[in-house]
């Protein structure tokens, strides 16, 4: 059900905004070890990662004030089983990666486990890193992510059709943390529901 909702999100926005639809994907993470290098309990890690969410959401609202936009945030496991967040942002009109620096800064200020070196807008080669911006491509074209909503949902869904016990071990650990905390894997903006 979520996959269908996420897949229809960008399609609906493309119908409303046409060629003005632009997308950005922000990645928010947190260190999975303490200052001594010891692994953190996965639930403690998740709670700290999510501690910045309200500040991130407010910063996103300020950055895009006066514009039409929606978001879809997805929790997804690393190979280690620890969680990171992908925030898909759908905007009417052009955006550039640097516009989202205040959003990344809000995460860094409010999540004690977030490290600046893991949240650079542009990497050492000058390529987009923590924030990737694209003009949404039309489904008939071969370049770009065809549907960012579906792309984000694919992170969450993992391998479709498999039972949870048949998923890779890191995905099973992720499922256990989600179940133990009662957390949803996705957070849509009001207009993206």
Model-derived features with residue positions:
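Right-hand nucleic-acid polymerase module
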Residues: 1-83, 92-193
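Short hydrophobic/aromatic beta-strand micro-patches
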Residues: 88-90
């Amino acid at each position: 059900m979520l996959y269908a909702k996420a897949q229809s999100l960008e399609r609906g926005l493309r119908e409303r905004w046409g060629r003005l639809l632009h997308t950005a994907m922000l990645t928010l993470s947190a260190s999975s070890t303490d200052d001594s290098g010891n692994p953190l309990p996965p639930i403690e890690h998740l709670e700290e990662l999510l501690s910045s969410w309200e500040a991130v959401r407010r910063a996103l609202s300020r950055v895009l004030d006066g514009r039409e936009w929606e978001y879809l945030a997805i929790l997804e496991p690393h190979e280690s089983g620890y969680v990171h967040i992908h925030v898909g942002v759908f905007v009417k009109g052009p955006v550039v990666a640097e516009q989202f620096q205040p959003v990344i800064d809000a995460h860094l200020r409010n999540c004690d486990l977030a490290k600046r070196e893991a949240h650079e807008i542009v990497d050492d080669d000058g390529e987009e890193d923590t924030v990737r911006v694209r003009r949404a491509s039309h489904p008939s074209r071969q370049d770009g992510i065809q549907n960012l909503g579906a792309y984000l949902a694919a992170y969450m869904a993992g391998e479709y059709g498999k039972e949870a016990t048949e998923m890779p071990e890191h995905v099973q650990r992720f499922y256990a943390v989600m179940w133990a905390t009662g957390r949803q894997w996705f957070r849509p903006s009001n207009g993206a529901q």
